[in-house]
Amino acid sequence: MEQKQRRFTKNIFVLDANGKTLCGRIAKLSSQPYCQIKIGRVIAFKPVKNPEPKGYVLNVPGPGAYRIQDGQDIISLMLTPHGVEATTERWEEWKFEGVSVTPMATRVQHNGVMVDAEIKYCKGMGIVQPYMRNDFDRNEMPDLPGVMRSNYDVRELRQKIQNERESAPRLQVQSVSPREESRWMDDDEAKVDEEAKEMIPGPSRLKKLREARSNVFKEVEAEINWNLDEKDEEDRDEREDEEQVKTLSDDDEQGEDASDDEHPKTHITKEYIEKVAKQIKLKDERFMSLSSAMPPASGGFDRMIVTKKLKWQNVPLYCFDESSKRYELQCVGACERVAFVSKDMSLIILRSAFRRL
């Protein structure tokens, strides 16, 4: 069931000092300055002494067709010497004089008490006489340069545009996060990632992604020995990793036992050593030819290998610049990105506090 539009009461106080309209004559006969026209659920028409709060005061010199324009609210009035017509609905068959509204802060007497109130003042000139037929036919198409008449009327055209908009395929908005992640990848990884996005989702996509990554890295670093199936080489790598972790742990314990006067406290934490050891044991093909090294408080690197999204706690954080290939210790804390860089034949793992591009 269609809901009826709610009507708001509008109070218009016509001020006709000359008494040329019916409103002015009634006000003079009652010795009052205003004639109130109330439009809403009910209609009222009476002379009054002063306007009410939030009312419209329409000052007119005589008969005319007046249209009060107050934002979304439009009030159309026909004031003649013998009658009054007013509406808040559309009334387009007649011409009207548009009257703008000026809000004013005033003091008026309301219900026997003087109160502060806002009234809206508007002044008409009487340049449009009542009931002048509007010569513009809304159904007639004017002759406009560069404009042709459509085969549809306005309602049909709006419905047609809406149907086309709803039936058109909607483009899926891509998330910004993959684009953001690609900024932290090296050229090889970004290329593989773009190729993987074109593949169909599912287990086959993951399998193809792994194969593509393996092929790209083998082409880029062909000089590395990729024979990883030999048992003796795997055992040798594991022993080297364990020796590196043991050396790092011994250095860390020696630094803690030494006094602060003789040796300053190191920024290498136990959590960092454990995280580095786990990364070394992953046997990443990009790091197989590099030996692990501990980063000093500041230094440089030769190239950025890759940046991974890893959440580490209580680790040294570095600010590094890819353009100058320098890094500097900032503090010890938590991070979400870890950069893998190389210096000579050493692998350095830097936790990113932030980076300058």
Curated annotation (Swiss-Prot):
The keyword Manganese does not apply. Residues 162-199, 228-268 are annotated as: Disordered. It comes from the Viruses. SUPFAM superfamilies: BTV NS2-like ssRNA-binding domain. The keyword Cell division does not apply. InterPro entries: BTV_NS2, NS2_N. It holds the Pfam family BTV_NS2. GO terms for molecular function: RNA binding. Single-stranded RNA-binding protein. Belongs to the orbivirus non-structural protein NS2 family. This is Non-structural protein NS2. It comes from Bluetongue virus 1 (isolate South Africa) (BTV 1). The lineage of its organism: Viruses, Riboviria, Orthornavirae, Duplornaviricota, Resentoviricetes. The gene is Segment-8.
